[in-house]
Amino acid sequence: MATTTRATLRQRLSEEMGDYQSLTTTSDGNSAGTSVVDTGLRNLPGGADDDAFEGWYILATSGSNTGESRRIKSYIANTNTLVTQEAFSGGAVQSLVTYELHQHDPAQKHQAINRAIEELYPFLYLPIRDETIVVDDRLTEPAWRC
C-alpha cells in the first residue's frame, strides 16, 4: 500500500498556495549559522533585489539542520545570501544542503495538514488486518481435549 510522506503533503499544499521553492545551497553560510548562500535565488522572481525574501521562511531538508525552520531577516542580492533572524541549532549551513523557501510558516502548514488528517480520518481510514501469523484454530478441536 502506498503512503504519502509529510514532506510530500507539505509540498503539495505549498504548490497549491503558489508558495513552494526547493533549492540547494551553493556555498557555506557563516559560522554563526545565520546565513544561507545560494546562487539559485537570483533566478527567482525578485531575486536580483535586496530584501526580496524578507519575512519568508527557510526550511532545511538535509544536513545538520534538517527539519529546522527560520524566518528570513534580510536578503543580500549581490552575495546571494539569506540572513535569518535566529541561528540554526546545527551551526553553519554547509554547501549542497537542500532547503525549501516558503512565504508562509511551514509550522502553520503542518498544523493545517494535521487538522485535515483529523477531519478526514473516518472517511479515508483503510483498516489493515495483519494475518501473517494466523494459522488455524486447532485449540478448539475436540481431539485436543484432555
Feature map (PLM): residue ranges:
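Glycine-enriched, solvent-exposed interface loops adjoining structured elements
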Residues: 1-30, 40-69, 74-89, 94-146
